[in-house]
């Protein structure tokens, strides 16, 4: 995440401007709170309960991947996958890659696009997330 001269994230309309190319654009906490009409404590609760994905860079700056939101609210399908993966022990950046990056397994689509294509695809991705968690836990 980039910094302005005053060491604050570079923002425009609630977006952190230099979000990585790997997980897409990010919202600031302020933007998410405004969009969801919740307090910062409410947002913290959503993060702690694995309902919203928050990423933190090496400088301690936080961002919320835009891909988990749809029409000014949390995308429930994406939220379900995020909750499964975070709850199963995956770190937030791995979850972001899992959800956002296109895969040949999904005909070159990312998880969000693939789940939106059909109920069968959504069911498949939820089952795959659960299987990945089971595999992770079996190996630790």
Regions picked out by a protein language model, each given a short descriptive name:
Residues 1-140:
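Non-transmembrane "mature" sequence context
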């Amino acid at each position: 995440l980039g910094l302005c001269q005053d060491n604050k994230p570079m923002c425009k309309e609630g977006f952190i401007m230099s979000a990585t190319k790997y997980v897409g654009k990010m919202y600031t906490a302020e933007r998410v709170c405004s969009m969801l009409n919740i307090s910062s404590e409410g947002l913290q609760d959503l993060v702690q309960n694995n309902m919203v994905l928050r990423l933190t860079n090496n400088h301690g700056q936080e961002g919320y991947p835009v891909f988990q939101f749809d029409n000014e609210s949390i995308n429930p399908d994406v939220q379900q996958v995020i909750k499964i993966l975070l709850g199963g022990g995956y770190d937030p950046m791995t979850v972001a890659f899992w959800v956002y990056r296109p895969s040949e397994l999904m005909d070159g689509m990312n998880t969000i696009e693939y789940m939106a294509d059909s109920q069968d695809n959504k069911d498949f991705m939820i089952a795959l997330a659960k299987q990945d968690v089971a595999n992770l836990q079996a190996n630790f």
